[in-house]
Amino acid sequence: MNGIYALQQTFVKFSLLALYHRLFWVNRHFVRSVWLVGIVQGCWGIAILLVHIFLCTPMEKIWTPWMVEGTCVDVNTLFAIYEALNSVLDFIVAGLAIWMLPSLQIRKSTRWHLAGLFVLGAFSGFIGIIKIVEAYDSAQRNFQAVIWNVVQMSISIICCCAPIYRSILPKMGMSSIPSWASWSLRGSSRRSKAVASTADGTSKFSMRSYQGEGKAGGTSVSGNWINLDGSSQRALAWVDAESHGKDQSTYQDIPMGRMKVERSVEVI
């Protein structure tokens, strides 16, 4: 269990550090800190894994300590050392995120939500301290250590998966956010109602068109711009439609009584 725990804690912190590097790579001092913490964490994970593999000499004594003579590492001392270092690394990783959080150009409410998640990551470090204190209670040491390991690993996974929560969970205290499904699929089904066919085979757009000049994202636009009211994002689209009402020479494969409409919509 402890060998798996060391690997899990190492890769969880690697994922968080990789996210930090991707977000704040322009800050050289911060990037150096990320690399330093990553190297220390990697050395910690490898060392703990090797120590648990070669915990006793000979190795058979790990599985049958009452049958094989040999020596083993003091488990309590080892536990206190690697849990203390792991807690310090938890606090450092959470502190790095909170340090750079004010530089993000996001809403204040979102900043508070992210800060709460990072504080939850720091709580993983406090769990490590609790494990050290209770490790010397030999009566329930093994049972409680397993429980605290599971709790600590679960909290770590919750924190490292934080970037995807916005797309799969509703906003806390706010209206529900769109589903993870593509908004363009929903928008296209709504925009399809904008095309109405007439008896002579021509097509008309019932959506509002921007005639003249307007602005979209700070740039001036003109022409047949339409507002994508059905979408979950503010955007304008240029619509270029052609109708083929009586030209039967080009579209001989269209059955009688039906009409073929071609549309090209470019979203910017």
From Swiss-Prot:
CC terms in the record's Gene Ontology section: membrane
Protein's UniProt keywords contain Electron transport: no
UniProt topology in membrane: Multi-pass membrane protein
Miscellaneous note of the record: Trichothecenes are sesquiterpenoid toxins that act by inhibiting protein biosynthesis.
Pathway this chain belongs to: Mycotoxin biosynthesis
Similarity-based family: Belongs to the SAT4 family.
Protein's cellular compartments: Membrane
Domain of life, per lineage: Eukaryota
Presence of the UniProt keyword Transmembrane in the record: yes
Organism of origin: Stachybotrys chartarum (strain CBS 109288 / IBT 7711)
Protein name: Satratoxin biosynthesis SC1 cluster protein 4
One Pfam family it belongs to: Fung_rhodopsin
Residue stretches spanning the membrane: 34-54, 78-98, 113-133, 145-165
UniProt function note: Part of the satratoxin SC1 cluster involved in the biosynthesis of satratoxins, trichothecene mycotoxins that are associated with human food poisonings. Satratoxins are suggested to be made by products of multiple gene clusters (SC1, SC2 and SC3) that encode 21 proteins in all, including polyketide synthases, acetyltransferases, and other enzymes expected to modify the trichothecene skeleton. SC1 encodes 10 proteins, SAT1 to SAT10.
Key words of the record: Membrane, Transmembrane, Transmembrane helix
InterPro entries cross-referenced by the UniProt entry: Rhodopsin_dom_fungi (IPR049326), SAT4-like (IPR052337)
